Amino acid sequence: MLSEDEAKDLLSFLTLEMRADVKGQATGYILGLTGNRDGCRYLQSKPDFLKALVTLTSDPSIAIVKDCFHALINLSADETLHQPLVKETEILSKLIPKLQDPEFVFSDRICTILSNLSRHEQTCRDVFKALQELNVGLDRLVEIFCTEGFNKKASLHYLAPLLSNLTQLPEARHFILDKDRCVIQRLLPFTQYEESITRRGGVVGTLRNCCFDYVHHEWLLSDAVDILPFLLLPLAGPEELSEEENEGLPVDLQYLPEDKRREEDPDIRKMLLETLMLLTATKVGRQILKSKNVYPIMREFHKWEKDPHVISACEKLVQALIGDEPEVGMENLMEVEIPKDVEEKLQELDAKEQEQMEKDKQELEKSQNESPEGLER
């Protein structure tokens, strides 16, 4: 790495006033450092370099700004850099307001940086607080996200994982679930947004987080929100169901066409199942999912699914749908207190199950990659 004198000289080149060619070489060197862990950890102890990168995101040179944003994306991907970036620089106050500029070229990079910084609770709170203080707020963020073509130069897909990360905070979920704001209803259609897996996954993650607030389950499943079809449709396929089974389903799930395709990403399929599973944690949720005939959709999905982790999530949901009701006093599974020894045993069993599923997944991938003997590729 650089000596102290070399670092001092390099830092002197990272100013708005420096000649563009010299500055470009300096930002290019810093970008190279951020391409590996050792370089990132070196910069972790150099807050002046971090400050300079943030400042240069306002440079007149597009090439220099691009390098700085690329470097900040790399740095923000390293959790150990989150606190230095948030506490030692003006990264939040400099970048967040630019999201509201429909002409800003680098908005997608800002979304990625904010998504990275909000992955863990401590800096997630910093991001949430900054949004409020800078008069952007979740309401404006959702409005920008839901306005197609808001920025002609950026897709803003990474606002979805940012929203998902923010909803790990109770106060963010409280906003999304505010019955007077009609926020969650605006997000629901994006569970089937074909143009971007990032947008779909982020929205499904947001819905899953919101379903941890079980007091809202009845409202979420009511006609006021009608969340169920938006969770089920990506899991439903073209299989023909009986007339009786179709009639029991929500209208949007009835008599699906022969070319109906399921969600292609296994991680999103798993999150959808986990969201449905959360809704079965309350008595009212279980009753509604059973009355809406969710089981046939899951039955056909289970036949189709190949990923071991997703299959396991599906089987747990099916068990909740067809199993007996919990005994009196245990109707709300999120309020049940589990003895510590039982909890530890369950965690141990879950770890073993995860390990076995990972082995199964590796075996499946291996078998899919091997060519049948005697056949030309």
From Swiss-Prot:
Entry's transmembrane regions: none
Region (Disordered): 339-377
Record key words, sorted: Coiled coil
Stretches assigned to coiled coil: 340-373
Xref: Pfam families: DUF383, DUF384
Keyword Coiled coil: yes
Family: Belongs to the HGH1 family.
Protein name: Protein HGH1 homolog
Gene assigned in the entry: hgh1
